[in-house]
Structure formats: structure tokens, C-alpha cells
From Swiss-Prot:
The keyword rRNA processing applies. It catalyses: uridine(2552) in 23S rRNA + S-adenosyl-L-methionine = 2'-O-methyluridine(2552) in 23S rRNA + S-adenosyl-L-homocysteine + H(+). Coiled coil: none annotated. The gene is rlmE. It is found in: Cytoplasm. The active site is at K164 (proton acceptor). S-adenosyl-L-methionine binds at G63, W65, D83, D99, D124. Belongs to the class I-like SAM-binding methyltransferase superfamily. RNA methyltransferase RlmE family. This is Ribosomal RNA large subunit methyltransferase E. InterPro entries: RNA_methyltr_RlmE (IPR050082), RNA_MeTrfase_FtsJ_dom (IPR002877), rRNA-MeTfrase_E (IPR015507), rRNA_MeTrfase_gammaproteobac (IPR004512), SAM-dependent_MTases_sf (IPR029063). CDD domains: AdoMet_MTases. GO terms for molecular function: rRNA (uridine-2'-O-)-methyltransferase activity.
Length: 209
């Protein structure tokens, strides 16, 4: 019975996905994913990216966010990206394939950042979803805590943090933690984000000293 429910849910998701206007637009424009449109909407309202910036992109594959940010930071900017999945090369993006939860991968990522002053850390990481919130939400919260840990390690004073979070247990505490570290925190739900999805994007700017 559970398998039937899962297959019905998967079929519905696939049907929604391939008829989604943002998926169709992404294909038409030659973009890597519909996530490009989410980031574009956030950039229009929050102006996170400027020419010459150094940006860390966590959960980067297939590359929609990195593809967008390259257009905003220009040739003098730099993106250090990481994902457990492979990603086709993008000019201006230094990509590391590996599991961000692995200490050796984290160490390698920090080495690539080096002494660079990172102005933005962004995370679109998500676990493999089972469809059961009691299982999925804790896994998601673990990833976003790791992303916040990366901010503590590399983000310059005044820098910004953009993170996808699934609303559920632990969300309010996480939001309070971010508010203690940044001067301004907003919650965004871009139009390109599916309405019934629990995902929201926390936009935190002005990292405190």
C-alpha cells in the first residue's frame, strides 16, 4: 500500500514538474534548473550579489544558482560550489564534488576558500525526501545548521546568508539563531517555489562582528 501511495505521489510530482511554467521557461532559456528564477526574484528584492564578490554555493548541482550568480558578480567575482552530485563545469565556478557532511569534504572546501573574504554563503541543500515530515525535517535542519556553521567559518562581517529551510520542528529556533548573528533577517517564498512546498528562503544580511 505504501509503495502504491509513493508511486502515485511520484507520478503527480512528475506531472506537475513537467507542466510547471518555470521548468518550461528554464528549458527554453537553456538554464540548468527552475531554481534560477527563485534566486532572480530574491536578488531583485534583496540585492545580495554585486560585481567582484566571492560566494559559496552549497547544494549547487545542477548549477542553477551558480549559473545565475556568475551573471551578477562578473569576471572578477568568484564562486566556490559544492554538492554530493556531479555538476557540469561553469566558467567562474570552482566546483567540489563531495558530501558536505563529511569532515574531509568540509576541510577541502575551506581550503579552496582560503583567505578569501566571502560576502555571501548560499545553501539550496535538501535531503532525499521520503514524504514523511517527521523523517525529512530533522535531516533538513541538520543540513541548514551545517550551512550556518560555514557562515561562522568564512563569512565576512557585513556578509549575507541565503538558505532554503523546510518549515517544521526546529524552524523557529533556527530563525532565532540566525537573528542573533545578522542585523536583518527576512523570510521569502518566491513565486517559482511550489505553493504546497514547505520550503522557504531565509535571507540574512549584515553579519554581526
Amino acid at each position: 500500500m505504501a509503495n502504491k501511495k509513493r508511486s502515485a505521489s511520484s507520478s503527480r510530482w512528475l506531472q506537475e514538474h513537467f507542466s510547471d511554467k518555470y521548468v518550461l521557461q528554464a528549458q527554453k532559456k537553456g538554464l540548468r534548473s527552475r531554481a534560477w528564477f527563485k534566486l532572480d526574484e530574491i536578488q531583485q528584492s534583496d540585492k545580495l550579489f554585486k560585481p567582484g564578490m566571492t560566494v559559496v554555493d552549497l547544494g549547487a548541482a545542477p548549477g542553477g544558482w551558480s549559473q545565475y550568480v556568475v551573471t551578477q558578480i562578473g569576471g572578477k567575482g568568484r564562486i566556490i560550489a559544492c554538492d554530493i552530485l556531479p555538476m557540469d563545469p561553469i566558467v567562474g565556478v570552482d566546483f567540489l564534488q563531495g558530501d558536505f557532511r563529511d569532515e574531509l569534504v568540509l576541510k577541502a572546501l575551506l581550503e579552496r576558500v582560503g583567505d578569501s573574504k566571502v560576502q555571501v554563503v548560499m545553501s539550496d541543500m535538501a535531503p532525499n525526501m521520503s514524504g514523511t515530515p517527521a523523517v525529512d525535517i530533522p535531516k533538513s535542519m541538520y543540513l541548514v545548521e551545517l550551512a550556518l556553521g560555514m557562515c561562522r567559518d568564512v563569512l565576512a562581517p557585513g556578509g549575507s546568508f541565503l538558505v532554503k529551510v523546510f518549515q517544521g520542528e526546529g524552524f523557529d529556533e533556527y530563525l532565532r539563531e540566525i537573528r542573533s548573528l545578522f542585523t536583518k533577517v527576512k523570510i521569502r517564498k518566491p513565486d517559482a517555489s511550489r505553493a504546497r512546498s514547505r520550503e522557504v528562503y531565509i535571507v540574512a544580511t549584515g553579519r554581526k562582528l
